[in-house]
């Protein structure tokens, strides 16, 4: 005796009702041979739909066993059941359950997507099936543009897409007029003649009369099993499905998931835009703050270079703010001369500073007069805009030749007279301007201080009358480690003074400190901006949860036609990631726009974007989509298909 296509033994199905379990099916035994056309008839609540759901692998029995071609379904995993639905079954629903935003052809193609068939192959078959069912002119119509009979024919074509060896038709004419219902039953009879196993579920005895076999069920028990005519032998249909095409099938499913996600986002444009808003603001904030931090760092480091390239500063006292430093007079020009001959030194300059009133004609301003050596301008990396520098001979001769900076030139010569060659008064001492330096990026609070550079001998001897200097600046050779030089300078000066009555500052150390500080501040401010990203991510999660609720029936249909849990999970996860990626792209564009405007309004201070920051922004967008999209996607993947299909 041959094994029946379907064998049901002792199947019961119970559902919880309060504290009790209600048995809807009770010890059902049923065999269905391949090629049969059978009707399951019963009143509402008789258990016929529950039995159909179990036969279609949409539900599992509470007790008993269900076999398909000798395979026990109760031991199958969720994805194995999905494979059975995809490869063996075709569903025809009373309410059609077509996806409203897809065309007739696209609706028919859905089962083949999950079977791994190529796009061109499934499209050709969809058109072929629709043409066969008289819908050649309606393949591009969405369901709302089709009549009830036409929608049911699309549903039949979808059931046949992967072969439809077993067709489960739940009240297939229940929502149709008499003429359309007759057409549908004619199609089902033709499919039966071709070898398809047809299982009708109906309450209408007239519909049941189309079947060769009628099984009546009441209160969960089969009460009769009769044949209208002797079952004719029919050839089994050729299966149109095949195994998924490995990685190509997976790529194709992923491509379709991307397309479907894009279509879902486009279908709710305003909602999607509002959902993206939090991501846009968050990404724009993080990117802009990062660019602002990079610009600040560059500006500060550029300003530090005004202290000299790779320099060490020697000053009297124990450190900045030492109240006793003014009483220490051991730091003298001879210390600078001793440093000049050291192998690690590029150039050296003593510095001594005082503040005086500087006059030129009717103009009087407060300015800083800095006494320096001839190498000062090399040490500090200052460049001339006009004129020339004073030299070593000027230093020896206590020359009254001076160089002024761009700010002093601007304020002392508002009439735009060339300062070179002009005489100014430093307090009561006349001095001749021989050069003007270019504007520099000053470091510290004295951004716009007026400065006059004079030979240190002139400032010490003619203006202050003291032998000591305020500090000595040493420019280190580029091929020498500043850390080793700092120790060598300390030993040399300490040996000369007999005590450590001075302290050193290293421009390299200052640079490192500034870099660390600006990075820390940027990170701190960015962490505040990240809050916006988190809020945006929560918004994405909320909207995706709403989307899952709204599309519950769609999920049920996809599961019924063979979608795996991973297919549903990936579809909704991709949708969440796509929302975040588009939001991230718009956020970066917004940040770039802000940067362009900022740089236009502030030419001296630039926001600087790096490729790394943009990559990080996109990575953040993707991560947010994955993290906050996972819960809604998982909920969608775990939906009960029976419950999903039952929702309006």
UniProtKB/Swiss-Prot annotation:
Similarity annotation: Belongs to the ABC transporter superfamily. Macrolide exporter (TC 3.A.1.122) family.
Source superkingdom: Bacteria
GO CC annotations, alphabetized: plasma membrane
Residues involved in ATP binding: 42-49
BP GO annotations: response to antibiotic
Subcellular location: Cell inner membrane
Name of the protein described by the UniProt record: Macrolide export ATP-binding/permease protein MacB
Residue intervals passing through the bilayer: 273-293, 528-548, 572-592, 613-633
InterPro entries tied to this protein: AAA+_ATPase (IPR003593), ABC3_permease_C (IPR003838), ABC_transporter-like_ATP-bd (IPR003439), ABC_transporter-like_CS (IPR017871), MacB-like_ATP-bd (IPR017911), MacB_PCD (IPR025857), Macrolide_Exporter_MacB (IPR050250), P-loop_NTPase (IPR027417)
Keyword vocabulary terms for this entry: Antibiotic resistance, ATP-binding, Cell inner membrane, Cell membrane, Membrane, Nucleotide-binding, Plasmid, Translocase, Transmembrane, Transmembrane helix, Transport
EC code: 7.6.2.-
Uppermost EC category: translocase
Subunit structure, interactors included: Homodimer.
Function description: Non-canonical ABC transporter that contains transmembrane domains (TMD), which form a pore in the inner membrane, and an ATP-binding domain (NBD), which is responsible for energy generation. Confers resistance against macrolides.
Topology of this chain in the membrane: Multi-pass membrane protein
Domain ABC transporter per the UniProt entry, residue ranges: 6-251
GO molecular function terms noted in the UniProt entry: ATP binding; ATP hydrolysis activity; transmembrane transporter activity
UniProt keyword Secreted present: no
């Amino acid at each position: 005796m041959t094994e029946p296509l379907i064998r049901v033994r002792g199947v019961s199905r119970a559902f919880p009702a309060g504290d009790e379990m209600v048995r809807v099916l009770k010890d059902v035994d049923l065999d269905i041979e391949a090629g049969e056309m059978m009707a399951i008839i019963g009143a509402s609540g008789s258990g016929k739909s529950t039995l159909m759901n179990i036969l279609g692998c949409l539900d599992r029995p509470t007790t008993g066993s269900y076999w398909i071609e000798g395979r026990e379904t109760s031991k199958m995993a969720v994805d194995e059941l999905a494979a059975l639905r995809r490869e063996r079954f075709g569903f025809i629903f009373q309410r059609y359950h077509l996806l409203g935003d897809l065309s007739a052809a696209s609706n028919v193609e859905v089962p083949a997507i999950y079977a791994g068939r190529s796009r061109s192959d499934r499209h050709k078959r969809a058109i072929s099936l629709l043409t066969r069912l008289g819908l050649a002119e309606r393949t591009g119509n969405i369901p709302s543009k089709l009549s009830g009979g036409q929608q049911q024919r699309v549903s039949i074509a979808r059931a046949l897409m992967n072969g439809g060896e077993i067709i489960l038709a739940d009240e297939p004419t229940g929502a149709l007029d008499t003429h359309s219902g007759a057409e549908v039953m004619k199609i089902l009879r033709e499919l039966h003649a071709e070898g398809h196993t047809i299982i009708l579920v109906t309450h209408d005895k007239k519909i049941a009369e189309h079947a060769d076999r009628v099984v009546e069920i009441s209160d969960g028990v089969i009460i009769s099993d009769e044949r209208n005519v002797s079952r004719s032998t029919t050839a089994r249909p050729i299966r149109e499905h095949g195994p998924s095409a490995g990685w190509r099938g997976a790529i194709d499913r992923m491509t379709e998931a991307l397309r479907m996600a894009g279509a879902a986002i486009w279908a709710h444009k305003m909602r999607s835009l509002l959902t993206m808003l939090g991501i846009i603001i968050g990404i724009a904030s993080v990117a802009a703050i990062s660019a602002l931090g990079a610009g600040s760092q560059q500006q500060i480091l550029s300003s530090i270079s005004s202290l000299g390239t790779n320099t060490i500063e020697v000053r009297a006292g124990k450190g900045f703010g030492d109240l006793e430093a003014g009483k220490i007079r051991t730091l003298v020009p001879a210390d600078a001369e001793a440093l000049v001959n050291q192998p690690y030194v590029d150039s050296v300059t003593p510095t001594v500073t005082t503040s005086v009133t500087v006059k030129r004609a009717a103009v009087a301003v407060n300015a800083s007069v800095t006494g320096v050596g001839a190498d000062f301008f090399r040490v500090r990396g200052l460049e001339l805009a006009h004129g020339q520098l004073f030299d070593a001979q000027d230093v020896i001769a206590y020359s009254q030749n001076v160089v002024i900076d761009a700010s002093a030139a601007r304020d002392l010569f508002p009439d735009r007279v060339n300062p070179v060659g002009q005489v100014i008064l430093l307090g009561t001492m006349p001095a001749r301007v021989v050069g003007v330096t270019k504007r520099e990026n000053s470091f510290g609070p004295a951004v716009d201080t007026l400065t006059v550079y004079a030979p240190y001998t002139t400032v010490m001897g003619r203006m202050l009358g003291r032998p000591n200097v305020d500090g000595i600046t040493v420019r280190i050779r580029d091929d020498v480690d500043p850390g080793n030089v700092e120790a060598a300078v300390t030993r040399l000066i300490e040996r000369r003074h007999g005590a450590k009555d001075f302290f050193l500052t290293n421009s390299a150390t200052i640079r490192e400190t500034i870099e660390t500080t600006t990075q820390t501040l940027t990170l701190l401010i960015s962490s505040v901006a990240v809050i916006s990203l988190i809020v945006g991510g929560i918004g994405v999660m909320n909207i995706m949860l709403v989307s899952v609720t709204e599309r519950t029936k769609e999920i049920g249909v996809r599961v019924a036609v063979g979608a795996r849990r991973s297919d549903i999970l990936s579809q909704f996860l991709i949708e969440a990631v796509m929302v975040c990626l588009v939001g991230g792209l718009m956020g970066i564009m917004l940040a770039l726009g802000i940067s362009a405007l900022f740089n236009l309004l502030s030419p001296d201070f630039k926001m600087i974007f790096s490729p790394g920051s943009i990559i990080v922004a996109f990575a953040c967008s993707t991560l947010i989509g994955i993290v906050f999209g996972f819960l809604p996607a998982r909920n969608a993947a775990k939906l009960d298909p029976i419950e999903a299909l039952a929702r309006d």
